[in-house]
């Protein structure tokens, strides 16, 4: 592939890690953010210490606060901003962009009030004459591992296979490999909903439960994620792939996962306000829990784990009571769909 110019919107941990992957592949990378001190740090010291204390970035990675300068003559734009501001940033891009580009996003969540997937938001806010079909970049990936060039395999999903293949080639190298998929709904919902289950898995750890319980919440969590995804139009097969069970395992079992750490802290009795203040990073699983719960209620999808976590987070239900409520649910067959 010829050298491409890529704007990465969002200098968080994942945006920074993906910027390094693109730079390693010989592309021009422009990171955009709205915190001048952070942007200056990236440009002056080639570090982003809020997320990576010991990592030095390549000096060719340049950061900007000016969106127009960032987007000038770019070939592709990668959104890696928090879910709650995706629509706002997309509107700003639509007002600034003056040519057609490839649009990708690597964020995982649902818009809090509308419950919409992020690709839907991007389609609504960026006119067709300025963009390709949206490509979702998702899968089992800790930024802390990708930034040190540990092996990572994820998915590029788009309704248009050729566009997904472009992104596959854009990112893939000896340590970072992408597979293509045309099931955008499946890949996107899997990436968003696994954060809820990760909060639950972390809570079990914080409460002192063992591996049996953690394995159960991942397996049963995958079942309810799949039910909701299929109700929205996804293929059930997607949930057995990298963006489904793969992402659920890595997020639901690792201390690297901010959603797992948030659940662990909840299990140990910390308040949600303290957890969010101490972590200093967006915990997508918190807002996604409400969106998924309300969506499941609307569609009539059975999601007992999501419901339990929703009750704990938004109604103050005791975590142990929520767990034992699930254990006392009506008996069901394992493969029962509702």
Curated annotation (Swiss-Prot):
Pathway: Membrane lipid metabolism; glycerophospholipid metabolism. Its EC number is 1.1.1.94. GO terms for molecular function: glycerol-3-phosphate dehydrogenase [NAD(P)+] activity; NAD binding. The active site is at 194 (proton acceptor). The keyword Oxidoreductase applies. Coiled coil: none annotated. GO terms for biological process: carbohydrate metabolic process; glycerol-3-phosphate biosynthetic process; glycerol-3-phosphate catabolic process; glycerol-3-phosphate metabolic process; glycerophospholipid metabolic process; phospholipid biosynthetic process. The keyword Magnesium does not apply. Sn-glycerol 3-phosphate binds at residues 108, 139, 141, 194, 247, 257-259. It is found in: Cytoplasm. InterPro entries: 6-PGluconate_DH-like_C_sf, 6PGD_dom2, G3P_DH_NAD-dep, G3P_DH_NAD-dep_C, G3P_DH_NAD-dep_N, NAD(P)-bd_dom_sf. Keywords: Cytoplasm, Lipid biosynthesis, Lipid metabolism, NAD, NADP, Nucleotide-binding, Oxidoreductase, Phospholipid biosynthesis, Phospholipid metabolism. NADPH binds at residues 13-14, 108, 143, 258, 282, 284. It catalyses: sn-glycerol 3-phosphate + NAD(+) = dihydroxyacetone phosphate + NADH + H(+); sn-glycerol 3-phosphate + NADP(+) = dihydroxyacetone phosphate + NADPH + H(+). GO terms for cellular component: cytosol. SUPFAM superfamilies: 6-phosphogluconate dehydrogenase C-terminal domain-like, NAD(P)-binding Rossmann-fold domains. Belongs to the NAD-dependent glycerol-3-phosphate dehydrogenase family. HAMAP family: NAD_Glyc3P_dehydrog. Catalyzes the reduction of the glycolytic intermediate dihydroxyacetone phosphate (DHAP) to sn-glycerol 3-phosphate (G3P), the key precursor for phospholipid synthesis. This is Glycerol-3-phosphate dehydrogenase [NAD(P)+]. It comes from Streptococcus pneumoniae (strain ATCC BAA-255 / R6). The lineage of its organism: Bacteria, Bacillati, Bacillota, Bacilli, Lactobacillales.
